[in-house]
Amino acid sequence: MQRRSTLKALTAAMALAGLSALPAHAADTIKVGILHSLSGTMAISETVLKDTVLMAIDEINAKGGVLGKKLEPVVVDPASNWPLFAEKGRQLLTQDKVAVVFGCWTSVSRKSVLPVLDELNGLLFYPVQYEGEEMSPNVFYTGAAPNQLGAVVISA
């Protein structure tokens, strides 16, 4: 289920974000940023997420990519260091020129990179539940907020 959701999200993200922002002379690839900790305390949780996104990218590319363009993953390691998420997010958007970012496993990592996304008009797919009461046009919150979880409990 998680893999299928990631696959659908990647495809939607490329269609929405990447193609309209690409320069006319762009290569036949769309760069996808992966912002998950591969070292430090959060690596045990986030390495699996990185692997899931890479697997989804491989599946999309095997089917011809997105609108004929292959997806090119750009993986960075913020090393479970919350301020480093902002720095690595900036690197992905400005130096690596990714069209979209998948990443962050904690609210503090998301909140660290959020000002960078807002400043540079980047797009983040955030893969986990969050506390709610935060809205950004630069973040797809794919996890449930508390009010959504409460509705399920009440209807059960």
Please describe what each predicted stretch is.
Residues R3-T11:
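N-terminal export leaders
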Residues V66-A79, M135-V139:
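Short beta-strand elements in bilobed, periplasmic/extracellular small-molecule ligand-binding domains
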Residues L22-A26:
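Sec/Tat signal peptide C-region and signal peptidase I cleavage site
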Residues G33-T52, V76-P83, W105-V108:
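Extracytoplasmic "Venus flytrap"
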Residues T11-A21:
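Bacterial N-terminal signal peptides
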Residues V74, A79-A99, S155-A156:
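Short, well-structured alpha-helical segments in soluble
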Residues A27, D51-P73:
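Signal peptide-proximal N-terminal region
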Residues K97-A156:
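Extracytoplasmic ligand/sensor domains, especially the bilobed periplasmic-binding protein
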